[in-house]
Amino acid sequence: MFELQVVSNTPMNAVDDADVVAETFLVQIGYLPKGYDPHTGDLSVRDSIPYRLFMRYLMDKPDKAWTVDELAALLETTRPTIYRHINKLKSMDLLESLDVMTADGQVRKGYRIRYGDLTKAWSFTEANVSLAMENYRKTAARLQELTRQRAEQS
């Protein structure tokens, strides 16, 4: 199911700090909640698991497909925690899954930014937003029509 938070925003073209842009962007799209307070002993959002997962692994190595076990070990957390954050990014259509050969020769599912490029991945997100907005418009029109019919029958 596609899910994304959409808020009015200004492009951050004048900001040169990738971490500032990332933190703002990730809050705006709903990946990180506004006022996010890490549940662990992390000192800041940038030390948190969801932020490091996105920036230090998915964005810093966009061509690599990461397994959940790799990410859990690197981030020193549990597999369910990794899945929770992976699923949130998948719901925004920002990630793709690929088969990955592990060191022991097994094939596992790995995740990376779609096409290894956030800009290209975002085009999928935009397409989903357009479709969702069109469906909302149709639903609003249907509600208006049904309400008008009900008023005429009264």
Task: Specify the residue positions occupied by each region the protein language model found.
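N-terminal leader segment of winged-helix/HTH proteins
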Residues: M1-S44, S48
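Short, cationic-aromatic polyanion-contact patches
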Residues: V45-P50, V100-T125
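Amphipathic alpha-helical dimerization/coiled-coil segments
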Residues: G116-S154
